[in-house]
Design a protein with these regions (language model features):
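Extracytoplasmic, non-cytosolic globular domains
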Residues: 22, 29, 36-54, 59, ...
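Beta-strand initiation motifs
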Residues: 18-22, 78-80, 102-103, 229-230
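A broad, low-specificity signal marking well-ordered, structured residues that form hydrophobic/aromatic
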Residues: 22, 94, 118, 130, ...
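N-terminal, active-site-proximal structural segment of metallo-dependent hydrolase catalytic domains
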Residues: 12-76, 88-92, 146-150, 244-274
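Bacterial N-terminal signal peptides
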Residues: 2-11
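Structured beta-strand-rich core segments of catalytic domains in phosphoester-bond hydrolases
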Residues: 59-137
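Metal-dependent phosphoester-hydrolase catalytic domains
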Residues: 112, 158-167, 175-276
């Protein structure tokens, strides 16, 4: 697996080739009692990590009106960012992007009633588009998650998304381990093997992303067309070669990710770490 917080995209020109670093992020980092970003812990993490393309879950804020969602995107990322959020659903998925969203939509996940798969075609620098897909798989069982992955794979193939374009599937997979059947199902579309993102410590939990830091719930998976451009995540003086599992309780120095507070990743009902 290549779980990129950053990729380098070559953009050909008449005289010189240019590169653009693009930071990708999967984030189900709501907190509080309403599965929303209202309390602010997740918002500070977004501000501190400064991602370019975000596959977000539980995309709730305020009254969930268009105005409130736009205000959240402005606050967490900036007024120039574009977004697509699925219509309806109690805990909707979405894609947020620094770069123009050319087309976006949702695919019905018949396994669950409160969210769908969300996709966006994004005009990143260079001659290829990037397709970002935001997913939130079930906690109920590995077999149910594999059913969802199979459905998603069929949607992607039917679209179709060109193999020559960039593809990233990111979000909350709720996987108990790195070898679940849903991961194998998606392996024909994206790179699923290690090395994996880490929180930068030597702790045995450093690769895990759930609140208890004992399971790899969250993923950023890219296709082989994109994985060749993978590059380390650079934040301040630190480089995370294989991507970052961000936990404010262990990250140091926090001054590099201001305005994040040390307790943000441990906030009440924050069940996941951000992955970049």
């Amino acid at each position: 697996m290549v779980a990129l917080a950053a990729m380098v995209v070559a953009s050909a020109g008449f005289a010189n080739a240019q590169t653009t670093r693009i930071r990708l992020m999967a984030a189900n980092i709501t907190s509080g009692n309403n599965q929303s970003y209202d309390p602010g812990h997740g918002t500070r993490i977004f501000q501190g990590l400064d991602p370019d393309i975000i596959m977000i879950q539980e995309f709730n804020y305020g009254s969930d009106s268009t105005t409130d969602i736009r205000n959240f995107v402005n606050l967490a990322f900036g007024s120039s960012f574009q977004y697509f959020r699925e219509a309806g659903g109690g805990i909707p998925n979405g894609v947020i992007s620094r770069y123009p969203i050319l087309e976006a939509g949702e695919w019905e996940d018949t396994n669950v009633s409160d969210r769908e798969f969300v996709w966006a075609k994004i005009d990143v620098p260079g001659d290829k588009n990037l397709w970002a897909i935001s997913v939130h798989l079930l906690t109920s069982s590995s077999s149910n998650r594999n059913n969802q992955a199979t459905l998603l794979k069929n949607f992607i193939n039917a679209k179709p998304i060109p193999a020559t374009d960039y593809l990233v599937i990111g979000g909350d997979f709720n996987t108990d381990n790195r070898t679940e059947s849903c991961i194998n199902t998606l392996s024909s579309l994206v790179v699923t093997s290690g090395p994996y993102p880490s929180d930068g410590t030597s702790n045995s939990s450093r690769f895990n992303t759930n609140a208890g830091r004992n399971k790899p719930y969250d993923w950023v998976l890219v296709n082989s067309t994109l994985s060749q451009y993978g590059t380390g995540v650079v934040i301040g003086s630190r480089t995370f070669t294989n991507g970052l599992v961000f936990d404010s309780r262990v990250y140091s120095p926090l001054s590099e990710v201001s305005p994040v507070l040390s307790g943000d990743s441990g906030a009440t009902n924050m069940q996941h770490m951000a992955v970049v």
